[in-house]
Regions:
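Short edge beta-strands and adjacent turn/loop segments
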Residues: 294-306
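A short amphipathic beta-strand at an alpha->beta junction
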Residues: 335-342
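Amphipathic alpha-helical domain-onset/packing element
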Residues: 283-284, 327
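Helical "lid/coupling" subdomains associated with nucleotide-phosphate turnover
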Residues: 1-282, 288, 305, 309
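Short helix/loop capping segments that flank catalytic or ligand/cofactor-binding pockets
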Residues: 52-53, 291-292, 318-320
């Protein structure tokens, strides 16, 4: 019982400060603290950090309500700590969206979190949506797979989604491969840096996920599916970019009023990027329209105002080439070049 150990009997602001000082002294007794590298990344897990993240997002009017991988900056943490400390237990119970169980442990928990941050001089930390339970599961899986730590958390997340959600005749994996090939081959004209690769991976893996909700205009529904999927190893910006990339499989679907909702996360440069990636993924989809994997590879030649895609096929791919050419006007609009597929 932290209040008892700290010698306080109330939850007044002064009492919270005393708990903070007590925890700091206890932490400083740990030898390991002296050896923590200044470049270490910190992750906050558990109900206290989840509540901190929720309060921080509200206080900053953060546009995206996603818990996992929310970045909590030190000034925002300080602001939330001060507010919670001054409210006390009774008023803290009135905070909207905070469960009663969380409120009961919040004052003590936030004192511990603040003490850790102060002692280690943490400028920013990631909030984990997973708890100790998930950590134990991951540890068990890692031991079984003889892989510590996971080399590609995003890859594992996407594979899990594919296994549990894909239908029997899904061509997601093949469209993903074609999209990655096109992204590399068209680098000269799309001019996108590697910071967009994770967003492309997510969007290409989940390009048709909206079909589970509604087949017609599924690109729009994919937006919400991606935002609400359990994706690890990526930032909120990556997730948002991926969601908008799916929408931009038809660039005309991109609504400016939807985009400006996230102006605290996205930039004008990002808008051009999602349009380009959206068309790349749509082209990959068109090149596997029969779902038979007829197009196995693509080589790109850029000649003046034209882009020539030379397909490597394992059978008759006339249908796929015809479907790909239907994207010509959209390709010209986004990349300012004519498209030819052979």
């Amino acid at each position: 019982n932290l209040p008892e150990k700290a010698g306080v009997a109330t939850t007044s602001p002064d009492a919270v400060d005393k708990m903070l000082d007590f925890v700091k002294k206890e932490i400083e007794k740990i030898d390991l603290i002296e050896h923590v590298d200044i470049e270490t990344s910190f992750v906050g897990a558990g109900s206290v950090y989840a509540t901190l993240g929720k309060l921080a997002r509200r206080s900053t009017h953060y546009s995206l309500d996603i818990e996992n991988n929310y970045i909590l900056e030190a000034p925002v943490f300080e602001k939330v700590y001060s507010v919670v400390k001054d409210l006390g237990l009774d008023k803290t119970k009135k905070l909207k969206g905070i469960s009663e169980d969380s409120v009961d442990t919040l004052l003590c928990g936030i004192s511990i979190a603040k003490a850790v941050s102060d002692v280690l001089n943490i400028e920013r930390m990631s909030i984990s949506g997973d708890t100790l339970r998930e950590g134990l599961i991951y540890s068990y899986i890692a031991m079984e797979a003889n892989e510590k730590p996971f080399s590609d958390m995003l890859g594992y997340s996407l594979e899990n989604i594919r296994i549990f959600k894909d239908q029997k005749y899904s061509n997601t994996a093949h469209v993903y491969n074609l999209a990655v090939i096109l992204f590399k081959q068209l680098k000269v004209i799309h001019k996108l840096s590697r910071v967009y690769v994770k967003a492309l991976r997510i969007a290409a893996s989940m390009y048709d996920s909206g079909k589970r909700i509604c087949f017609d205009n599924h690109e729009k529904y994919s937006f919400n599916v991606i935002l609400n999927s359990p994706l690890n190893g990526v930032s909120h910006k990556d997730v948002l970019l991926a969601a908008f990339t799916c929408v931009c499989q038809n660039p005309d679907n991109l609504n400016l009023s939807d985009w400006v909702k996230y102006k605290d996360i996205l930039t004008e440069e990002d808008m051009e990027a999602v349009k380009k990636m959206g068309v790349i993924i749509k082209l990959a989809d068109q090149l596997d329209k029969s779902r038979r994997g007829n197009v196995t590879d693509i080589c790109c030649d850029i000649l003046g105002d034209s882009v020539i895609l030379k397909t490597v096929v394992k059978g008759n791919a006339d249908f796929e080439i015809m479907e790909g050419m239907k994207l010509g006007p959209t390709f010209k609009k986004i990349f300012k070049k004519y498209l030819e597929i052979i």
